[in-house]
Regions:
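Feature activates predominantly on carbohydrate-active enzymes
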Residues: 1-175, 181-188, 195, 244-246, ...
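Substrate-binding groove of N-acetylhexosamine-processing glycoside hydrolases
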Residues: 20, 56, 60-63, 69, ...
Length: 492
């Protein structure tokens, strides 16, 4: 499953090339995670600046996927994660909450406090289902698949606004389930089997048995220690068909967290086989603007394919040769793509769903900055200086060994260069914070000027690379490069 809703909407040519390679790895299902990036006729103002896939493009991709033995499954989030639809003047009334609010974070998951903007539909608003029907009637005819993933994960706003009284009276879990069933009826009426993310229903174990039996629950989790075994067993006990859904761990990292991903992919395969999962979905998310490119994800696509088919015979040592032969066409580039995913370990920081390399440079947009800096950046400045400098040196060394010092060559090589250089700037920023903290203005100005110069080069190279892979412009993906330039200039 490829995220196409956080900043990168791939061109049809990119997706066709992706499908060819996925087929080489015996991957037989592809989903494109969609919030607002299908070209719905009535909502051009929602998707236009992001780019969107058209019905014609989907039909062409669907045809080629069928020829390759891949089921292209439609994917449209239908409850939460609909922020950009709910900012549309005619759709604001469908939002559960009308204003942004500060989320207190979650100690269990490691999520920091930050601002949430309205993103969840009000299940009790009379216009909600007609809105979804309109999306489904336009989207689904473009797919030949018998399945449809309606999402419905992370409904953060539920019970905070329009449905508060209903949730207080009936319980949030029951309100969620009732709306999920209403969506299920819409999907069934269109001849599809409904898939949905299982995170919310798992919070209400007693309600799992009340799910319709002809659905597929998607049991997702992305950390090495995610309790797939426990969660999968709950769906199995209730006789609900389910997939296990691990991830590539590339999002909010720039260059990967391959150590975590390998453990996560393996745990999902093991638990899925034991509990009778009917599928294994490798997810590749784009949180934080999706700055990480496909080149960073390919090592874990390959690892996930191997583990999904037979975890007992998986041999990590074979990944680089296979990637060199089938994806990169070059052993040095393949090795760099694999090795970069372990560089973050040198910082000595264990974080959930991110690394400092990804989060430092891609910090939030200006309106969210104050809250993020108050709560989310504190520990970056505490990383030991020698670890930061060592990490920077290792990134530079890997680029040098792979002869990837310039943004040239194949598209995959360009992507490795850009991702690694952005990670290197994150190291520079951490070092800049450290010298600033001790009042070393000479070093602070020197490093700051170097960062601004490198960010300017990155911005130009990113814009030159972008149209080779993606639709629209990179403004939703690489805007943080300009934000960081402004930050540093203001401090020099």
């Amino acid at each position: 499953m490829l995220d196409i809703s956080r900043g990168r909407v791939p061109k049809l040519e990119t997706l066709l090339d992706l499908a060819e390679h996925l087929a080489d790895f015996k991957i037989n299902e592809l989903q494109l995670y969609t919030e607002h990036t299908f070209a719905y006729r009535n909502y051009k103002s929602v998707w236009q600046s992001w780019g969107a896939l058209t019905g014609e493009e989907i039909r062409k991709l669907d045809t080629r996927c069928r020829e390759l033995g891949i089921d292209l499954v439609p994917n449209q989030n239908s409850f939460g994660h609909l922020r950009y639809f709910l900012e549309h003047p005619k759709l604001k009334k469908l939002a559960e909450v009308s204003e942004p609010y500060e989320d207190g974070g979650d100690a269990a998951t490691g999520n920091q406090e930050f601002v949430r903007r309205p993103s969840t539909l009000a299940p009790n608003h009379p216009g909600t289902l007609p809105f979804l029907r309109g999306l489904y009637d336009e989207l689904l005819p473009n797919f030949s698949s018998d399945f449809f993933n309606v999402g419905c994960d992370e409904t953060w706003d539920l019970g905070r606004g329009q449905s508060k009284r209903l949730c207080d009276a009936r319980g949030k879990g029951r309100v969620y389930l009732d709306f999920l069933k209403r969506i299920h009826r819409e999907v069934s009426a269109r001849g599809k089997t409904m898939m949905f993310w299982g995170d919310i229903i798992l919070k209400y174990p007693k309600l799992i048995r009340r799910l319709p039996k002809n659905v597929v629950a998607l049991n997702w989790g992305y950390e090495a220690n995610h309790p797939f075994a426990k969660e999968a067993a709950q769906f199995a006990k209730a006789k609900i068909p389910f997939y296990v859904c691990p991830g590539t761990s590339t999002w909010q990292t720039l260059i990967g967290r391959h150590d975590n991903a390998l453990a996560n992919l393996h745990a999902a395969a093991k638990a899925g086989k034991k509990s009778g999962a009917i599928g294994y979905l490798i997810t590749d998310w784009g949180d934080g603007g999706h700055p990480q490119p496909l080149a960073i994800s390919w090592p874990m696509f390959a690892a996930g394919a191997a583990l999904g088919w037979n975890s007992k015979t998986f041999d990590e040592r074979k990944l680089v040769p296979v990637l060199a032969r089938d994806v990169f066409g070059d052993s040095k580039a393949a090795k760099a793509a694999f090795d970069l995913g372990f560089v973050h370990k040198k910082l000595g920081v264990k974080a959930i769903n991110e690394t400092p390399l990804g989060t430092v440079i891609a910090a939030p947009r200006p309106e969210d900055r104050e809250l993020f800096c108050r709560n989310g950046l504190k520990w970056f400045a505490k990383i030991r200086r020698e670890r930061v400098l060592g990490t920077f040196a290792e990134i530079e060394d890997l680029l040098r060994q792979a002869k990837l010092l310039s943004c040239s060559g194949s598209v995959l090589e360009m992507e490795l260069n850009l991702a690694a250089r952005m990670a290197a700037v994150s190291c520079m920023f951490m070092f800049w914070q450290q010298v600033a903290a001790v009042g070393n203005k000479i070093a602070m100005n020197c490093v700051g000027n170097l960062m601004v110069a490198e960010l300017q080069k990155l911005d130009a190279d990113f814009k030159a690379y972008w149209p080779q892979r993606n639709k629209a412009t990179p403004k939703h993906c690489s805007a943080f490069l300009q934000w960081r330039m402004d930050d540093y200039r203001n401090c020099l």
